[in-house]
Amino acid sequence: MKANILRTRFKSILLILGILALGFVASPRPGSATVSADGFQLGPEVVISAIDNEKYLPAVAYNSNHDEYLVVWQNKWPGNRDIYAQRISSRGELLSWFAVAPGPGGNPYDRAQPSVAYDPVNDRYLVVFIHDVFGDGSDWDIGGRFIPWNGPDSGLIEFPICTWNSSQWNPVVTYALAQQEFLVAWTNTPSGQPAYVSAARLNRDTGAVLDDFTISAGPENRINPDVAYNLARNEYLVVWDRVGGSHDIYGLRLTGSGVALSGGEFAIAGWPDNEEQPTVAACHNADQYLVAWQSLVGPPTNYDVYARYVSGDGVPGTVFLVDGTTAPEDTIDATCLQDGRQYLLTWQTMYAGGYYGIWGRLVYPVGMEASFGLVQPGAAADRTAPAAAGGQVNYLAAWVHDRDGTAYQDIHGRLIYLHQLYLPMVVR
């Protein structure tokens, strides 16, 4: 049972409107899904990778041409780290898995912190990551590799994205459909100076850097960037965590060509509590962003998760509590359906036994539904670090899944289907 506190759950008449508006959509296999009291369906839990090692930091992208997902993650082996991937159909079938990096053209040292985006024009993914330049941890750069939709091509080698002398961390990538290029953002940590956030526009065909520039710098550290692309305007919103007297969340809108829009950076969450580790998604049908974060309401470790709408023209709107109990809720992730009409938030929450499970919440541009459990913790094992992507009629959420009774960490996931309307079949 979840931590013992009465939880406020929001219900919305949009639940009914959503069923009527969505009409008929594809269903999972009969008997393969759990139907919630709120009408959505959870597909069966899927073991994405169970190789005997430790896995971290899953990231997910949706392939609109082939109606499938790609999950990437970081492996930790004795003595090294690398990046693997698994293709998964929109019905939850495992299609193929493969190594991403180190790949052709790269050094043999560690790769970590992957992020992935899909290019429907070239029908391939860009996976970005940090890599250990000298193998001693003294300099970490940003690299990338294009992966065709059905698996790696040895002719598509790793390429550099940022090779500055300062170390780079936590890269995130998105694809701009109208601009037909990628945007990558990351944190720089120059020696003896505050950390700051940078970005680069990448050519979709070659990976060449078209332009790189500073997103935000100043006397305080800027860390933990995330980025979303808004097709309605051909614009981006980059968000980050600014560390001053407390942690606050800021954002900056960019044109498709990377030019900062009027007004510059703006505050999204700046209250006395620490607001940390932002995530952002764009729903282009509503011309809107959803920014979420964890807020330290009970130091030192009791976080709640909050979210705020930001309009397409950069006006912060309603703030709402996503989940809050006397136990920590943190590490939140946001995504949106491909057609831009509904968000999904996923996060980890501590249960009464002290171990984490994964929860989620469907959010519309004007309201949200009740939160729901995706997976409970094991008897003595965590489920953490959720990530998700939205497809045409469902989402895929993935997480780090401690293997019960071992030191291994696997990657698991499950599909979340939209509200569906079933009519009885009449046989005459």
Q: Which residue stretches match the model-derived regions?
A:
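Extracellular, repeat-based ectodomains that mediate carbohydrate processing or recognition
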Residues: 31-422
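Gly/Pro-rich, tryptophan- and cysteine-flecked surface segments typical
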Residues: 424-426
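Cleavable N-terminal signal peptides
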Residues: 20, 30-31
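Bacterial N-terminal signal peptides that target proteins for export
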Residues: 2-14
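Bacterial N-terminal signal peptides
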Residues: 13-25
